[in-house]
Amino acid sequence: MPTALITGASSGIGLAFAQALAARSHHLVLVARDEARLDKVAGRLRAAHGVDVEVLAADLSDRTALERVADRLRDPNRPVDVLVSNAGFGIHKRFLDGDVAVEEQALDVLVRAVLVLTRAAAPPMVARGHGAVITVSSVAGFLYSGTYAAAKAWATTFTVSLAAELAGTGVTATALCPGFVRTEFHERLGVADRSRIAPGWAWLDADRLVADCLADVSRGRALSIPSRRYRVATTLVRHVPLRLALRVGRRRPGRPA
């Protein structure tokens, strides 16, 4: 049975990936900061699907903890076939109003962790001739909206570039770019009422999102943008004049996942 390592696996999109991959008979390595919560998730998945579930508590903004996760990906005796880089970090304030230390921590999680873990996972996959790298990015990466958007733009470009580099190896790389998703992400940013952020039609279901992404992975697609509404929106954003794109980026009462 294949093994998938998922970061940010205790809730939201990461949990949806864990459930979907367990249902597809993947053993799991679940990574998040909250070990107690991970243990509960692991117990439920073992009982429901009969798969092995390993828990690895780690704060990916901490370089020592990140290296422990990278070591797990490199372990030749316990190969990982699927890497899902999903760990998130919300930024509450605009760049000029915020704390640079918080911005740096966000980049450690959203950029450096993706870089380090992908570099640890991909070479063993290539050596075995199969595997998949999935990076959870965001449609925010197509906007001009501060450090979070810039980090997601990097994640998308990095992963799509990696897909080209991996062509012919049997290993795929896919950047998942969701819009607004019904998870705990916005509640953690202090936004309890989702209607303040976006209308009801804009919100996506995490389980459906993951199912669509895994279908794109199986097709070898480098970019997965769920739902027609977001595919149309991102196409428009990429082709509008810069002045208009900047105006859209300034209007940010909340962010897509």
Regions of interest found by a model, annotated:
Residues 118-119, 160:
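A short, exposed helix-loop element centered on a Lys and neighboring polar residues
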Residues 10-11:
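Conserved glycine-rich cofactor-binding loop
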Residues 24-40:
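Conserved glycine-rich Rossmann-like NAD(P)H-binding loop of the short-chain dehydrogenase/reductase
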Residues 175, 196-233:
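C-terminal helical subdomain
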